[in-house]
Amino acid sequence: MTQTPEALTTEQFKQAIIDKGQYYHIYHPFHVMMYEGKATQQQIQAWVANRYYYQINIPLKDAAIMANCPDQRVRQEWIQRMIDQDGEYPDGGGREAWLRLAEAVGLSREQVISEELVLPGVRFAVDAYVNFRRRASWREAASSSLTELFAPQIHQSRLDSWPQHYPWIDDKGYEYFRSRLSQARRDVEHGLTITLDSFTTFEQQERMLEILQFKLDILWSILDALTLAYVHNEAPYHSVTSKRVWHKGLFK
């Protein structure tokens, strides 16, 4: 009879989570291209427009966690993430800040909000993440947020490199990245506490690490879709038309 491996200690488990950072999308060639100043304006615009679809789904995936969570104290803390992104009326929060980034890179907010530039591969990846959060237990869903461990580095990298490489981007567009530096660190502290307290057997810890890898897969796949369309010029249906004929806004 095979003996079940012993659970990782808290520190070992935390380190295993941190080690997943080697697969974070900061290392994706598309992000490296943007960081090194090698991206065209069209490529920057495409990233901003497609990432908008991820941004507007952040409150939905956080609401899914809250809907499944019976712990009032957890909900009281988690709701701040929704407020950060949606804002408190009439403030538009992170969503509005992202639209200012879109304008800063030369897009119109109407074009971005229409989602006409959102690639199917990006839409499928984001939808898969939201649907996972709806179906998973609240603890598992919360643990998938721990890619935020690596987020301050990626936001700082944009603040460090983009103004130098892309002087045509209006400085007001960087507000979102600046705000997320502190927000992400706060969110990580809460999410990490939940995760370390919730997954205490080897099987649970192994599953949680797979969940985190799933989230990393989502982020990487988004950039894969952008690379295919805007680096290799192979957008969906490129072999038969140059028009953006893929579905848009079907599930609004």
Swiss-Prot record:
Catalytically driven reaction(s): 6-(2-amino-2-carboxyethyl)-7,8-dioxo-1,2,3,4,7,8-hexahydroquinoline-2,4-dicarboxylate + 3 O2 = pyrroloquinoline quinone + 2 H2O2 + 2 H2O + H(+)
Origin superkingdom: Bacteria
Biological process according to GO: pyrroloquinoline quinone biosynthetic process; sulfur compound metabolic process
Annotated keywords: Oxidoreductase, PQQ biosynthesis
Residues of the signal peptide: none
EC number of this enzyme: 1.3.3.11
Pathway the protein contributes to: Cofactor biosynthesis; pyrroloquinoline quinone biosynthesis
PANTHER family: 4-AMINOBENZOATE SYNTHASE, PQQC-LIKE PROTEIN
Function: Ring cyclization and eight-electron oxidation of 3a-(2-amino-2-carboxyethyl)-4,5-dioxo-4,5,6,7,8,9-hexahydroquinoline-7,9-dicarboxylic-acid to PQQ.
Protein family according to the UniProt entry: Belongs to the PqqC family.
Record protein name field: Pyrroloquinoline-quinone synthase
Record organism: Acinetobacter calcoaceticus
The gene coding this protein: pqqC
